[in-house]
Design a protein with these regions (language model features):
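Secreted/extracellular ectodomain signature
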Residues: 18-204
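C-terminal motif of bacterial Sec signal peptides marking the signal peptidase cleavage site
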Residues: 14-16
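Bacterial N-terminal signal peptides that target proteins for export
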Residues: 1-7
Length: 204
């Protein structure tokens, strides 16, 4: 009986581990925020956060990009989140495809929702559903001050998406353009159900 129990427990452990597929992963939501509200160190800082988390989870040989848009600055054009993330397909941290290409990702038939938006570690632990994007539903830069001063400040505002596509505010069913934040501090994010998390995609 003891041997049989041991075999069962071992099988369950292996089965549990096999569900996490970092070698296939090309999409995740950050498991932790940077801790500085909307001041992420710009797009470069957000990308670096994605890269660190992905590699810590076991992903290798991929270039990770934060799904964030940014406004034009002196000598720099505006940046659309959709233009930063490659062409797809994208799979979550358990190997489930969320979209085949950019059109599907930003259309009605993507596979984004409560059961598929997972952090890089593959765990389904609850997390705040307000996800930073600064974007419109089509993945372009949101109009107005919606990027926390291009992700360099705790001043201004951000556009959130809803990872679970639920809620009673704004365009609640949108994964990338649900509503505006109350500000760009961590405390302001928390007022509507956020903490400063964002989506990461493998661009290659």
């Amino acid at each position: 009986m003891r041997i049989a129990s041991s075999i069962v427990l071992t099988s369950l452990a292996v089965s549990g581990c096999s569900r996490h597929a970092p070698d296939k992963m090309s999409f995740f939501v950050t498991s932790v925020a940077t801790g500085s509200g909307g001041s992420l160190g710009g797009l470069a800082g957000a990308d670096a956060h994605c890269q660190r988390l992905a590699e810590a989870a076991g992903s290798r040989g991929r270039q990770w990009r934060a799904y964030l848009s940014a406004a034009a600055e002196t000598g720099q054009p505006a940046v659309n989140a959709r233009d930063r993330i490659g062409k797809g397909p994208w799979l979550n941290s358990r190997g489930i495809q969320i979209a085949a290409n950019l059109e599907e990702l930003h259309g009605a038939n993507n596979n984004i929702g409560t059961m598929t938006v997972l952090p890089e570690n593959g765990q389904r632990a609850p997390f705040p559903h307000d996800i930073l994007t600064g974007s419109n539903p089509d993945g372009t830069l949101a109009v107005g001050d919606m990027t926390c001063r291009n992700w360099n400040s705790t001043s201004g505002y951000a556009m959130f998406g809803h990872s679970d596509r639920q809620g009673g505010r704004g365009n609640a069913g949108s994964w990338n353009s649900a509503h505006q934040s109350e500000g760009c501090t961590t405390a302001a994010f928390r007022e509507t159900g956020g903490s400063g998390l964002f989506y990461c995609f493998a661009a290659q």
